């Protein structure tokens, strides 16, 4: 899956071969396929594909990958942990307008 055109998922910060395999399992093989996608929906599809609820930290990485695919700056996966916890607690968020709480401490 090596590519010189920037489509290789492993060129994204936080996405190594292991995480790329989770994406591949649900048919995501290129960065462009992450644009305008709901990270929670992707994570839930990954969990369903593997027949178990996957580590919630994977959702942090999926959120990071989607943001990068949409042109936002690369951030470490743990930057997304507070938002992920809100999402999984049902507090919601706004992907179209950026991450909830963006720019707050």
UniProtKB/Swiss-Prot annotation:
Respond yes or no to whether keyword Amino-acid biosynthesis is given for this record: no
Q: Record's superkingdom?
A: Bacteria
Functionally, this protein is described as follows: Involved in mitomycin resistance. May operate with McrA or may be a type of transcriptional activator protein.
Gene3D superfamilies per the UniProt record, alphabetical: 5' to 3' exonuclease, C-terminal subdomain
Could you mention a single GO BP entry for this protein? response to antibiotic
Q: Which UniProt keywords apply?
A: Antibiotic resistance
Cite the InterPro entries for this sequence: Cdd1 (IPR021725)
Annotated protein name in UniProt: Mitomycin resistance protein McrB
């Amino acid at each position: 899956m090596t590519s010189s055109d920037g489509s290789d998922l492993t060129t994204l910060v936080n996405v190594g071969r292991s995480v790329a395999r989770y994406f591949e399992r649900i048919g995501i093989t290129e960065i462009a396929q992450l644009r305008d996608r709901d990270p929670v929906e992707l994570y839930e599809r990954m969990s369903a594909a593997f027949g178990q609820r996957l580590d919630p930290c994977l959702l942090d990485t999926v959120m990071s990958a989607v943001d990068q695919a949409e042109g936002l700056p690369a951030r470490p996966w743990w930057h997304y942990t507070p938002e992920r916890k809100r999402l999984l607690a049902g507090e919601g968020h706004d992907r179209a307008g950026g991450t909830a709480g963006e720019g707050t401490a």
